[in-house]
């Protein structure tokens, strides 16, 4: 590991990162260390992703020009930007874990789960069924209407996204991010912090065709344009609060089970249900703050998320002995 990278991430580790709750004077220092490392990690990930996006885009164009990977020809720069950020996140993950003293999943508060299939399926059903039932009621009351033509290919992409995105995001946010902050023994602050980060990161999405001409600074331009959606404070607030609550539910599921399988199932279910419903039905106008552009934004979806949370906790308490 280079000296520069060590200098960027390095914060001196105390002999023990577990803090006696009775010692308030020594409590905040480890928490700040892990929070600072995590903040540096996310900032570096986004910045390096912005720098890598242009050469990654040019490489894709070079390959398609030679008849290789023709599907890349239909991908705009923003798609390459998101892949570059993901690549940077993976590349910086190992130094983050090493500098945080993590040598195994035990250090992140994760334990083997022999019932992982049950938790994965339960999570998927707990998030999918209430959301789709809500969507069915919207159609019945003519708030939404069925599309005349259903793009089954698009639904296939939603299925693929729910399978791929949910484990990736859960590993980063609830696995690594929450795991590092839980090492401070300050559980509630750890959950709130990672849920806020989870919500904020989802706003790092520039409008399509932001960079029609790609230059070396196009990635940084995409980062800057991500803040353009802040112009609509009601939509911003509705989306942030909903994502924050979803983050709380996912973090709670992870803490209660000491495993990522239940939150992965929940996450995959929300992606699938919201995405598939939007491909099957549509509505003409927004009705903020009650309903947003999809089933995951607004006060009503927030209530559905709360219902899922309540059902999940009761299932862990009564239907999954030993979990709660």
Model-found features: residue ranges?
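N-terminal, membrane-interfacial amphipathic/helix-forming hydrophobic leader that caps
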Residues: 1-117, 128, 132-135, 139-144, ...
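Juxtamembrane helix-entry segments on the extracytoplasmic side of multipass membrane proteins
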Residues: 148-159, 224-238
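Membrane-interface helix/loop boundary segments of multi-pass membrane proteins
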Residues: 168-218, 252-259
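Hydrophobic alpha-helical segments and helix pairs
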Residues: 137-172, 176
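Residue-level signature of the transmembrane alpha-helical core
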Residues: 120, 124, 128, 159, ...
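Hydrophobic transmembrane alpha-helices
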Residues: 161, 165, 178, 182, ...
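Small-residue-rich segments of transmembrane alpha-helices in multi-pass membrane proteins
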Residues: 119, 184-191, 270-274
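Acidic helix/loop microenvironments that form the catalytic cleft of cell-wall polysaccharide enzymes
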Residues: 201-202, 267-271
């Amino acid at each position: 590991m280079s000296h520069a990278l060590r200098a960027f991430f390095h914060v001196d580790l105390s002999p023990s990162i577990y803090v006696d709750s009775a010692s308030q004077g020594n409590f905040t220092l480890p928490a700040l260390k892990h929070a600072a490392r995590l903040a540096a990690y996310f900032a570096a990930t986004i910045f390096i992703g912005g720098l890598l996006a242009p050469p990654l885009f040019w490489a894709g164009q070079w390959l398609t020009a030679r008849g290789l990977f023709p599907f890349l020809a239909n991908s705009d720069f923003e798609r390459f930007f998101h892949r570059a950020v993901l690549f940077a996140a993976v590349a910086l993950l190992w130094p983050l874990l090493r500098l945080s003293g993590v040598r195994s999943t035990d250090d992140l508060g994760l334990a083997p789960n022999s019932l992982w299939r049950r938790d994965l399926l339960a999570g998927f059903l707990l998030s999918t069924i209430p959301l789709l039932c809500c969507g069915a009621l919207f159609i019945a009351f003519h708030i939404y209407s069925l599309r005349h033509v259903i793009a089954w290919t698009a639904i296939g992409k939603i299925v693929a996204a729910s399978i791929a995105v949910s484990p990736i995001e859960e590993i980063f946010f609830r696995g690594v991010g929450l795991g590092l902050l839980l090492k401070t023994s300050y559980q509630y602050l750890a959950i709130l912090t990672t849920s806020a980060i989870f919500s904020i990161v989802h706003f790092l999405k520039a409008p399509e065709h932001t960079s029609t001409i790609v230059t070396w600074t196009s990635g940084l331009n995409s980062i800057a344009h991500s803040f353009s959606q802040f112009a609509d404070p009601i939509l911003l607030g509705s989306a942030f609060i909903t994502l924050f609550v979803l983050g709380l539910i996912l973090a709670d599921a992870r803490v209660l089970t000491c495993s990522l399988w239940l939150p992965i199932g929940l996450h995959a279910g929300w992606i699938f249900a919201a995405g598939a419903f939007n491909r099957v039905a549509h509505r003409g106008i927004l009705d903020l703050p009650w309903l947003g552009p999809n089933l995951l934004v607004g006060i009503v979806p927030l209530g559905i998320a709360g219902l899922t949370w309540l059902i999940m906790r009761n299932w862990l308490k009564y239907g999954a002995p030993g979990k709660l």
